[in-house]
Amino acid sequence: RDLYHALFQYVQRADRIYEIGCGSGIFTHYLLRHFAFRQLFLNDLYRCPLMERYPSQIGDVCEQEIPSNLDLVVSSSVFQWIVPLEELFKKIAAALKQNEFFAFSMFVAGTLWELESFTHQGLPYKTPQQIKEILFRHFDIVEWKENFCTLSFPDCFALLHSLKQTGVNNLQGDFRLTKTSYRKLDESFDGKY
């Protein structure tokens, strides 16, 4: 929602929009309701129902050819997974028309530190400064916002449900939640997360 509000200050109409990582379509629905456009292109690793109605690319955006002559490229909570990020930003810059917009949100260093303290693993998130340095090489930054928020959950199950719904989990793949580890997490939960 913050991304949409920041973006809407600068752009209300964009003929050709490309969304990277449309996922379940939460941000896409904002675009559909509030932006005038001629073409919307969607990208995600997996097919979602919205992809039936718009030109789409299924697969890693780093391996896809980004449509050209774009007026707007958007992405919500995807770029923390992209390596190498600078290569993708170069592709985006080349695909945008001159003086058009690239707007995104992403998770940065410090995300889900509570979960990392329990699992002893986390993703190698970039710092805001590292992201700015990459951006300055390819774009003029019109607006930069950092938003730190803490979500609270009534119990361990609610936390895990939220992680599942958002796809954000901070894990690199070798942590498995077993009955024993769930019990330990539940015992250590005590309102910390």
Each predicted region: which residue ranges?
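A short SAM/SAH-binding and catalytic strip from SAM-dependent methyltransferases
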Residues: 71-86
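Short alpha-helix
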Residues: 124-139
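Conserved Class I S-adenosyl-L-methionine
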Residues: 24, 143-193
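A short glycine-rich, Lys/Arg-flanked "PGG" loop and its adjoining helix->strand segment in the class I
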Residues: 86-101
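Conserved class I S-adenosyl-L-methionine
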Residues: 101-128
